[in-house]
Amino acid sequence: MFESLSNRLTGVIQGLRGKGRLTDADIEATTREIRLALFEADVSLPVVRAFVHRIKERARGTEVSAALNPAQQIVKIVNEELIGILGGETRQLAFAKTPPTVVMLAGLQGSGKTTLAGKLAVRLRRQGHTPLLVACDLQRPAAVNQLQVVGERAGVPVFAPHPGASPDSGPGDPVAVASAGLVEARAKHFDVVIVDTAGRLGIDDELMAQAGAIREAINPDEVLFVLDAMIGQDAVTTAAAFGAGVGFTGVVLTKLDGDARGGAALSVREVTGVPILFATTGEKLDDFDVFHPDRMASRILGMGDVLSLIEQAEQVFDAEQAEAAAAKIVAGELTLEDFLEQMLAVRKMGLIGNLLGMLPGAGQVKEVLEQVDDKQLDRLQAIIRGMTPQERADPKIINASRRLRIANGSGVTVSEVNQLVDRFFEARKMMSSVLGGMGIPGMGRKSATRKSKGGKGKKRARGPTSPKVRSPFGPARPGMPDMMNMPPSFPDLSQMPDGLNELPPGLAAFDLSKLKFPGKT
């Protein structure tokens, strides 16, 4: 969503590099470009004016004039001001001292409230809570049924005493349903109640009155206004009107994966004064994240979001499996079965293009990322699943006739099977040598033994191999699939620009080796 803004701001930053001293003309030109970039992103006019004014004042102050690298100091100022308009610190959901915690969802029709209710319930359930969904949208046809479907997918019970709007039933009372849902939660010991309310095509008196009545009846701990980030300044106007009429404690931005300009996300916090709590980036129940202003600012400035990428990996990779895979890599015994498990885990993290987009400098290779096709991973998965357990455990036994059978069974060509097998052997060899060079215990002795055995003049047969390409991601981490083991149609990631192998400014001292995975002490 922020691609256009990110490209413009990145261009402004690059234009400052190499300048030892910034003149007033440089500052004026820089702030003018920033102003135009924000206007193009559909950011609210008052927000743009205040943002640019603060940058200009700080750029002319002593923190820039006394800096050893004034250009880098400007980047720091822009980053800090972006974090400021996005909310500053990360705001977590506030839980009641005495359960149940009541969360009320409000917003316009089509903003994604019902789907968000399921996403929030899944997140809370994984954190050990026992949520209950309450269906109070009794006006939109099939709204209650939709929430029941979402609740079933999320594995969370739904309280729906009224079927909702239909020719066979009269109008229901959402206030009574909300109150009854709270009684149900207390009786059955649910510790979180998520109330899904009705939306409108626009703010009107009826919407305000109904939302106000529900809020007064259940006294929620959190009122989250669900905002469609793709509708631009209308979203900010709507949020401001709802905040003045009913009030809310937090904002949830939906559809951040869309191609809109994203000005609403940069404006809503500054205009309403209410923090952004969550953001959604897709329709799946897992496409839901806590909103981190600092990480979002880092992504907008093209510095990536490495910490979010690490957190996603922590959620899908099991610590014991990661250690077992690392041991197999060290011993040179990684199998295609292990590779399949790793690939499936990566798929759980989301689209490959989105994951690569979290890396620093990814905005500079937009065309390359657009070529990444997740369907190629499906073809690799089909090839491996077409093998017998013995062939996955020992790919060396896959001869020509077996490769033909695998190709016919998985719907691919023999050439694709050959490429997968050959590249797997090459990647396994590379990972073993890399880990050995990192001082992994036992690797040095094992390598020396192999070398001495191979010094008797015996030549090993070798099949066709693919050209060796240095991975821009460095050595494969334990439990993570090696990015070298990609299908031939993937772009050449070795041609990516400098910066992809670096953490954003301020995170340079972050030691990935000290990261603790779940269940690991």
Swiss-Prot record:
Binding site for GTP: 107-114, 196-200, 254-257
Pfam families to which the protein is assigned, alphabetical: SRP54, SRP54_N, SRP_SPB
Main localisation: cytoplasm
Enzyme class, spelled out: hydrolase
CDD domains per record: SRP_G
SMART domains attached to this UniProt entry: AAA (SM00382), SRP54 (SM00962), SRP54_N (SM00963)
An annotated Gene Ontology molecular function: ATP hydrolysis activity
UniProt KW keywords: Cytoplasm, GTP-binding, Hydrolase, Nucleotide-binding, Ribonucleoprotein, RNA-binding, Signal recognition particle
Disulphide-bonded residues: none
Catalytic activity: GTP + H2O = GDP + phosphate + H(+)
GO CC annotations, alphabetized: signal recognition particle
Residue span of region Disordered: 436-505
E.C. no: 3.6.5.4
Basic residues: compositionally biased ranges: 447-462
Gene Ontology BP terms: SRP-dependent cotranslational protein targeting to membrane
KW Nucleotide-binding (keyword) present: yes
NCBIfam families per UniProt: ffh
Alphabetized HAMAP family for the sequence: SRP54
Function: Involved in targeting and insertion of nascent membrane proteins into the cytoplasmic membrane. Binds to the hydrophobic signal sequence of the ribosome-nascent chain (RNC) as it emerges from the ribosomes. The SRP-RNC complex is then targeted to the cytoplasmic membrane where it interacts with the SRP receptor FtsY.
Family that this chain belongs to: Belongs to the GTP-binding SRP family. SRP54 subfamily.
Oligomeric form and interacting partners: Part of the signal recognition particle protein translocation system, which is composed of SRP and FtsY.
Protein name according to UniProt: Signal recognition particle protein
Lineage: Bacteria, Bacillati, Actinomycetota, Actinomycetes, Mycobacteriales
